[in-house]
Amino acid sequence: MAVSFTNVSSEAGLKKLDEYLLTRSYISGYQASNDDLAVYSAFSTAPSSSYTNVARWFTHIDALLRLSGVTADGQGVKVESTAVPSASTPDVADAKAPAADDDDDDDVDLFGEETEEEKKAAEERAAAVKASGKKKESGKSSVLLDVKPWDDETDMTKLEEAVRNVKMEGLLWGASKLVPVGYGIKKLQIMMTIVDDLVSVDSLIEDYFYTEPANEYIQSCDIVAFNKI
């Protein structure tokens, strides 16, 4: 089923896309697809960070494209006032054909009038946000940390053990590697996935890395990358 967006170069188009992405990680489905690529390609520059959801989505798709590209087909998407092709976009001849009325059933305006169910769901989300005091619904984030030792004599195996020994709900440690810094010193780069509502990265660093016993090995820790997933 094709979906339509207004011009993402305009303030109105960005605002509506930002509202659409409030409860979604991708344009369609549960993984990056050609639909995301089509909308991504409609941007001449990165969107303003004031459009929180669009900026989060754009950064994530940009990172995926740099890593491995997008492989899923998607459902088809049209972005008005752009020249982005879509596999599900009807030909000009088809648009003028008598059967155009039937095509309209498959051309869904995502920003059209809401149904009663959609209005009710939006009200419930707004109530939940107000009750929790948060600006948006919880999600997950992928975080890359640089963990630095005191000197070249620090046992890096013990340092990594101290890091991975930090366990809490909503925290999952991932891949790691040692990266040379200079003068025989190496730092630990380690990935982690967190549930945003359950884990504060700043608090984790302050409360666990900079206190005993971890601070025997850890001199400092920096957040290198922080991306929504």
From Swiss-Prot:
It holds the Pfam family EF1_GNE. Disulfide bonds: none annotated. Residues 80-109 are annotated as: Disordered. Coiled coil: none annotated. InterPro entries: eEF-1beta-like_sf, EF1B_bsu/dsu, EF1B_bsu/dsu_GNE, Glutathione-S-Trfase_C_sf, Transl_elong_EF1B/ribsomal_bS6, Transl_elong_EF1B_B/D_CS. It comes from the Eukaryota. Residues 100-109 have a biased composition (Acidic residues). GO terms for biological process: translational elongation. Keywords: Elongation factor, Protein biosynthesis. One of its GO terms (molecular function) is translation elongation factor activity. One of its GO terms (cellular component) is cytosol. EF-1 is composed of 4 subunits: alpha, beta (1B-alpha=beta'), delta (1B-beta), and gamma (1B-gamma). EF-1-beta and EF-1-beta' stimulate the exchange of GDP bound to EF-1-alpha to GTP. PANTHER family: EF-HAND AND COILED-COIL DOMAIN-CONTAINING FAMILY MEMBER, ELONGATION FACTOR 1-BETA. Belongs to the EF-1-beta/EF-1-delta family. This is Elongation factor 1-delta 1.
